Amino acid sequence: MATVKVIVATHKQYRMPMDEMYIPIQVGAQDRTPLGYVKDSDGENISAKNANYCELTGLYWAWKNLDADYLGMVHYRRHFTVERFGDKWNRILTMDQLELLIEQCDIILPTPRNYFIETTYSQYAHAHHAIDLDLTREVLMNNYPNYLDAFDSCMESTKGHKFNMFIMKRECLEDYCTWLFDVLFELEKRLDISAYSKNDARVFGFVSERLLDVWLEANHKGYREIPVMFMEKQNWIIKSWNFLMRKLKSRNFDR
């Protein structure tokens, strides 16, 4: 039987899944009051970068410090599911359900988000700073030119796998994290975020959401998609309004 460990990234106390494969981890723990969970500041870590890397400080910790056949990451308010009905907390993906999925493939992903009228690039540029992706492309051009075609293809796509949620065979996660953090650490050297808002300063977490599909496409990886549940109520009117406001107030960008 394969061993599986899935971290649940959180910055606050929250209800957690009961299945033993889940490990709640406090991200940004180096600069916060302990919550009683595993801390991303233990062992080899980049906890100090949490303000800019978001949940990736948890992913880095899992990559460097956990030993399992499969590793994954979800969020305290977002979980995988294969069930359509019933109480959300009773529908969170279990080890028994996951075992059936990983018999078919090595990577589990959330169903893709489709922006329909936006490309991945334009959506990011409307919400953040286009230069983040432009400099990411430069990093790839310099260090990983074999990824450029996949990057351009993903930037022009209207859909993608978001949320930084996945469960991968250890070998796949090793390859992905080695590449991802090498790209992000180089991007960090080149990108000036001194004038960014607190939200936009989370740039490396945002960029990484767009890089997962680049890695998948460049390496011709197969995967299985399953739904994601948001554990709280969402106000879709406000969410849609904010989306429209970002478009109307968007910064200029070329693409």
Language model: regions and residue ranges:
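ER/Golgi luminal nucleotide-sugar-dependent glycosyltransferases, focusing on the catalytic module
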Residues: 1-255
